[in-house]
A protein has these predicted regions:
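Alpha-helical recognition segments enriched in aromatics with Gly/Pro capping
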Residues: 1-72, 174, 178-179
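Small-residue-rich helix-loop
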Residues: 77-175
Length: 181
């Protein structure tokens, strides 16, 4: 055995109970068909000892992360913010919901939000020169950033979604004949 960890440890690391149950059930049991995602009610209904395996199960953290990420994406913004509150207790719930609207798709477990949220909570220290593309100059870069800022400022808070932001920035690039990279 490697890395024996209790259920409580996984919960403390931000793994959802439904992901743990789903994953552990499939470690020793194979359902009929290809279905991998099961609700607790579905597991109870579908489970049979005849389909249980006697061979030793191999724990795969990547697979558990896949299950957990799936269940995280199924949560509503308020529900997910409430679950993440223990990892960012100093953040207001409405601000956390906004961060999660962007980062939700990238989370494998809830604990990861504390690291991913840092970019939204404080400006990182960086060298200004990294903003300037190789085939550009300071003036062109500043112009592009100002155009992007103006476009983003016109998007209402309730439309602050990944797709909306990408479309707005792509429009700035197209309308102003900017080079993307």
């Amino acid at each position: 055995r490697q890395s024996d960890v209790s259920v409580e440890d996984f919960l403390a690391k931000g793994y959802l109970p439904e992901a743990l149950i789903n994953y552990v059930a499939l470690l020793g049991w194979h359902p009929e068909g290809d279905q991998e995602i099961f609700s607790l009610d579905e597991l109870i209904k579908e489970f049979s000892l005849e389909r249980a395996r006697s061979s030793g199960a191999v724990f795969d953290l990547n697979k558990l992360n896949w299950f957990n990420a799936h269940y995280i994406r199924q949560k509503s913004a308020p529900e997910l913010a409430k679950l993440c509150q223990e990892f960012l207790p100093h953040i207001a719930n409405d601000q956390l919901e906004k961060i999660l609207a962007i980062e939700k798709e990238r989370l494998n477990n809830l604990a990861e939000i504390s690291e991913k949220a840092k970019i939204y909570l404080a400006l990182p220290d960086y060298e200004g020169a990294i903003l300037i593309f190789k085939k550009s100059d300071t003036g062109a870069t500043l112009n592009g950033l100002n155009l992007a800022l103006a476009a983003l400022n016109h998007i209402s808070e309730n439309n602050w979604q990944k797709e909306t932001l990408n479309l707005a920035l792509a429009k700035v690039v197209m309308d102003n004949s900017l080079v993307n990279g």
